[in-house]
Structures are given as structure tokens and as C-alpha cells.
A protein has these predicted regions:
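C-terminal membrane-cytosol helix-exit motif in multi-pass small-molecule transporters
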Residues: 1-15, 123-127
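Intracellular juxtamembrane helix-capping segments at the cytosolic ends
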Residues: 166-180
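Loop-to-transmembrane helix entry/capping segments in MFS-fold secondary transporters
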Residues: 75-76, 106, 152, 182-192
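A single, central transmembrane helix in multi-pass transporters
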Residues: 34-91, 109, 113-117, 166-167, ...
């Protein structure tokens, strides 16, 4: 699918033919981040995107534990959660072009962030209520899981959280690229990916410390 999508992406021209490749990866990475941080709107967008990946990494990491230890369900239910989350992000991202009418705007980013918080909190309470019926001697299958109405609330929260996440992050990506000079755009995107990875790693470290405590 990725290769197929690549084939229909319009070819981009070289915006800076005089660019020199620095073989020192660390030094060049620092320079890319410095340049990105010097552009206020761009850097704020990158931080917002990184926060999205921070939360996303935390949620994805907790799904196996949530499924088995809290809800008492098997790995097929965990796969269902992952599928629902992925579909939600995809639909939310796809819906941006219709909701924003193909305009670059952060008008609803704050509302989407509130939506992530709301559905995240409700997911916690829904999971807590559902855990009351946890039977440790037998893990629930998908059919058993879907047969109870209170489990559908968990799926709904997870889907909506992912969907508003898509509505949140896509406008920030658009802002990051729009306010970056074409000559630096690819390097700013690389800097964004680097900062994203640090946030995701930080999410993993924090979760590990909380688990240890």
C-alpha cells in the first residue's frame, strides 16, 4: 500500500540545488532542530505534533495491558482495539479536508485537543467500570467482549479519541509545511520526525517508571 501510494505522489522539484550534505549526522541534526526552533509558528506546530505522538505512543503501549490485565480479554480484542484506533485516526485525518474546506487553519486544534482529553478521561472511567466484571480464570473472546454494552463504550471512546487526534494533528502538519521555505521544508520535516521520536521515547520512559513505581 505504501509503495502504491508513493507512485501517485506528485514529483517535487529540487528547491535548493546548492545544498551541501554534512556527513556529521549529529551536528546536522542539531542544526536542523535549531533552524526549526527559530521559526515560531513552525516550532509550535512541531511541539503540538510531538505531543500527539507522545499521547499516541502511551495509548498504544497500554493497549495490551489494558486488554488483558484490566478487561480480562484475549489478544484478539487487543487487535480489535488497535484496528479501531487506526481507523479512527485515518477517518479523522481524512475528514480534515472536508471540515476545513482545504484551508490551512488551526481554528479547531484547541477543540480537538480538548476532545482528546475528554475521550481519554472517559476511556479511563469506562475501563474502570468494565474491570468490575473481570474474570481472571478465563480471557474474553471478541464475541464475548462485544456482547456486553459497557464494552462498546470503550470502543466508542477509543475511536473518538483517535478521530479527534487526526483532526488535531493534520492541521499542524499543514502549518509546519506551509510556513517553511521550500528550500528548508524537507529538513524541517526531518527535524520534526527527530523531535517526535524524542517525545515518544520520553513517553516510554515515563510509563516504565510509573510501572516500576
Amino acid at each position: 500500500m505504501g509503495l502504491g501510494a508513493r507512485c501517485v505522489v506528485p514529483e517535487a522539484n529540487n528547491s535548493n540545488k546548492e545544498i551541501k550534505i554534512n556527513p556529521n549526522i549529529i551536528k546536522e541534526s542539531i542544526q536542523m532542530v535549531k533552524y526549526a526552533s527559530s521559526k515560531n509558528k513552525v516550532y509550535l506546530a512541531i511541539l503540538g505534533i510531538s505531543w500527539f505522538w507522545f499521547i499516541g505512543a502511551a495509548i498504544m503501549a497500554q493497549i495490551p495491558s489494558l486488554t488483558r490485565d484490566t478487561l480480562g480479554a484475549d489478544e484478539n480484542v487487543a487487535n480489535l482495539f488497535l484496528a479501531v484506533f487506526s481507523i479512527g485516526v485515518g477517518l479523522g485525518s481524512f475528514g480534515c479536508s472536508y471540515i476545513f474546506n482545504n484551508k490551512i487553519t488551526t481554528k479547531y486544534v484547541f477543540i480537538a485537543a480538548l476532545g482528546i482529553s475528554f475521550f481519554g478521561i472517559d476511556l479511563y472511567f469506562a475501563s474502570h467500570i468494565a474491570s468490575i466484571n473481570y474474570a481472571p480464570e478465563q480471557l474474553k473472546s471478541i464475541s464475548q467482549f462485544l456482547s456486553k454494552s459497557h464494552y462498546w463504550r470503550i470502543l466508542f471512546d477509543l475511536f473518538c479519541l483517535a478521530a479527534v487526534g487526526g483532526l488535531y494533528v493534520v492541521p499542524l502538519f499543514a502549518v509546519m509545511q506551509y510556513f517553511t521555505s521550500p528550500a528548508y521544508r524537507s529538513r524541517v520535516i526531518a527535524a520534526n520526525n527527530l523531535i517526535n521520536s524524542f517525545f515518544m521515547a520520553g513517553s516510554t520512559v515515563i510509563l516504565s517508571l510509573l510501572f516500576y513505581m
